[in-house]
Amino acid sequence: MIRATQRRIELGLVTNASAGWKTVRRRWETDLAMYAPAVHHIEDHWRSLASVTERFGARSIGHALAGRAAARAAIDGGAKVILLSTLQNAPLAPLEKGVRYIVYGDCTSTQLATNYGGKTLGAPGSWICARIRRLKEHGCIFLCMSQWYQDALREEFEIPENQLQILPFYVDTEIWKPQANKIRNARKQILFIGGDLARKGADIVYELARQDKFRDVDFHIVSPHAEAGPSNIHPHRGLTSDSLDLVRLTSECDLFILPTRADASPIAALEAAACGLPAIITGRGGIREIVVDGGTGTVLPESKFEAFEKELSTYLDNSDMLAGRGRCARLHVEQNNSKTRHMQILHGVIARAAVSVQSPTAGVADTVREAIGATRRVTESAI
């Protein structure tokens, strides 16, 4: 009954596989399966053209063209509501009557350039911005992973409030959770997760491990590019996101550390918090909405070795603070980043978009109400 109801909404799921967006894709494809969505992976469309445009310094155009091709495939397959990630793939989406877009993102191109130290869009910039404004005028709903991102959308593109929706990403708190009977190791276990070691500040973590004061502390480096180091460095190169081995390792650790130099809303910080780990992290992008400074961890203004060394020492010397902030981290995720909360918001937005492209008949209204109610019962029964 639930599946039949939600299949009446012809949903296209068009997703990006860059960095943490692979995790968004994987979880959505599983947790939105009741819609039987038409699934399209952006990188499968116009891959060669995207690589050519990137080679000649027009990476943003390549991403937009690939997004357009994937969205076109979804429309040709009958999709009326297209859930698309990310904003960088959305500017050239086909704006057809009877089709509505929902675009999920974590930063604008301006934030991307400023936060990640890249170049601005240059000559195509005004055209790309104009296309995003056309998307806005077409009725697109913009899902925002953080308030930081939503504020930028409002300021840069004057998007009205009724087309903006805060939607923090989620973790399954039944999978990502503290160990029930955690064995306390005499050696504290510190966790770092990051694919791009330089951008994520791994050099600072390696330097911390070399300090004599931390010789009895174990540092776990989860990255396909993790390198060997002193004996208390433990590289984990083969762990994949959402794998049981990664969940197990995370729940076995005591503290999460991420001296990131450029970020938006890192999912690893959410997963660590769900497992009851406080964090020492740099306040980039929307991170302050994930880690509450002084409550669920410590948010530092810059990626400086001295600052991270001092904070790590403070946590290791104060077991009550370490445990207390870990409990608060778990509670913060339960309240703000649970699968139930994320899905209830997302189903409501999808239903709203579906209504906007169909005749406002009683049948459609009943379908939408039934879809929301059925989904709420399903998600609530899962927690």
Predicted regions and their residues:
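Aromatic "clamp/platform" in nucleotide-sugar-dependent glycosyltransferases that forms part
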Residues: 261
